[in-house]
Each structure stands twice: as C-alpha cells, then as structure tokens.
Amino acid sequence: MGENMIAIILAAGMGTRLRPLTNDISKPLLEINDVMLIERMIKNCMNESINDFIVITGYNSQKTDKTCEDLSKKYNINIKCIKNEKYDVTNTSVSTFLATDYIEKNDFAEDFILINGDNVVNPEIIHDISGSVNSAIVVDNVKELNEESFKLIVKDGIIEAIGKDISIAQSSGEFIGISKVINADLKDFNEILKRIIEEDIQNYYDFTFKDLSKKTQLTYVLTDGLEWTEIDDMNDYKKAQDMLNQLEN
C-alpha cells in the first residue's frame, strides 16, 4: 500500500430495498449521471491523494471485482478486493474487520478512511475528514433527524450513546457513515470491533466509535450543511440524483 491513506469502501450488502435495480449488482455499482457510485467516491478520495483502496465485496462480488479491476487500470490506483463470504448473514462490523484486520496484519503504517459504499457526498466532506489529525467521524449537525438516522450523543468529546433508537431531542446529530482512524488507534479500533462482532454478527461497525472515543481523542467533523445521502431505497436514489445534478452541473 502507499504513502498516504487507505480508503476502505464497504460494498458487500444486498441492497434489497432497491430491487430491481440491485438484482444483479451491489449498490455501489449503481450509476448516476453515467458514473457508478464507487467510481465517484474513488475520484473524491483521489482528489485527497488517496491511491490505495480496500473494497469489501459480498453480494454479486464477481461484478464488483471486475469493476474494481477496471477502475484500478483506468486511474492507475491499487484496489484490493476482500470478500465477506457471510455477507448475507452479517453486517458492516464483519465487513469492516476484514479490511482493518488486513491492514494490521500486514503492518501497514497508513491511516484509513472508512466509507459506506452507498454514500454520495459533496467532495468537501472527504476533504475535511482526510485533513483530520486525529481519528474522526463525520456528523451531520444540520439535518432534521428521523427514526432511521444513526444518531449520537456527544458530551465533552466522548460518545455517550450511538444508534438509531436514541431520542431525536437529545441527539447531537447523525453519523453519516464516513470516518477516519489514524494508525496509532488501529489496534484499539480492531480490539473493540472484534468484541462488537462477538456480541452480535449483525452489529454495525458504527458502535466501535463509542468505546474508541473513551480511549483516544476523536474529532467530530461537522457537515455544516454540506450535502450527502446514503442510498437505501428509491427515495434516496432520487435524492442522490437531484443532489448530484446540482453539484455536478
């Protein structure tokens, strides 16, 4: 892997709420304005001098593998694909660990950025988190929250609670599914993540940051109104199209 940072992109999920669009492909292979979500995100990362990627595949992995192979040639970058063989019964915690454990076992010295593969963002968000000196998570401090939002409560720099079931009134904002872990925190991150997986293989990796915030200085990178969305269903897909039409045209 390279000098700077590694970007981990999670692309294992089945995207059932987007069928028939995802009958044959994982969500990150969906196109908006003739560009796949994964290609757009890779380009956002390349703008921050990130040229090393780990993509976690699962559902329809052959197509994702082929796409990554094509993109690595097109942009002259390194993309390592690792398959989550249990993609249909696990969640993002297991997918994330496949990547972060690989980084630790190979003694890579880089920090990593962790990105949900169905995220569509204003590129400034990637710029802001890339520049963080500490481990960091991106928090939307503006959006009106709902039951589905991955909310968190932050007090004195520590995450007191994180999850969907937090009261909207108490919440400090929504975790948008983009984070950074510096190499010095990698061991702690992996130990916490492992424990979370042992508790429940259906857990989200997001919970890792609660305990990590007690062990290290976490930075909260605020969106301050910068646009983003994750694509879970057709409404989100439409929202992402509208957002990109404004950002890219």
Per-segment meaning from a language model:
Residues 107-120:
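Short beta-strand-to-loop acidic/aromatic patch adjacent to the donor-nucleotide binding site
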Residues 3-5, 174-249:
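Conserved alpha/beta core of the MobA/IspD/sugar-nucleotide pyrophosphorylase nucleotidyltransferase superfamily
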